[in-house]
Amino acid sequence: MFWVILRLEGVIMKTIGLIGGMSWESTITYYQVLNETIKQVLGGLHSAKCILYSVDFEEIEKCQANGDWNRSAEILSDAAQSLEKAGADYIVICTNTMHKVADEIERHIHIPLLHIAEMTAVELEKSGITKVGLLGTKYTMQQDFYKCILENRGIHVVIPNEDQVELVNDII
């Protein structure tokens, strides 16, 4: 998994700070895949060193619906600062949409925030993939915070038409 960072000098695992709760279902997936990957890489009973900060998704969703991305950034920046103070070596946001405020979060912390679009671009490049379909919430599909990162790395991004965007958003 792209966010598993191991330094192989005897194997020292880094502590991952997870900003989750958007939704708790997606957070479970991150936690599960992270631990399955650690077990696969290290074997035995190894599990990931991680710290989870779960935000109240109701508050985040209201901010999204009202276009109050500044308040969302404040909430997630507070979460990121808490994770940093708790000892996280880097941070992952356990959802695509909230990467819209990743730049603002980064301004409030002194540890790396791994941007999912950057990590996705790296994996696509490794696989030789140059064209992808982007599905997600309407914010992820219609705004540039994800798409531009891929396009700036030479990856053509295909997005559904407006009716399809609404359908996909409703399903999510």
Feature-to-residue mapping (PLM):
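Non-catalytic structural scaffold of enzyme domains
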Residues: 9-172
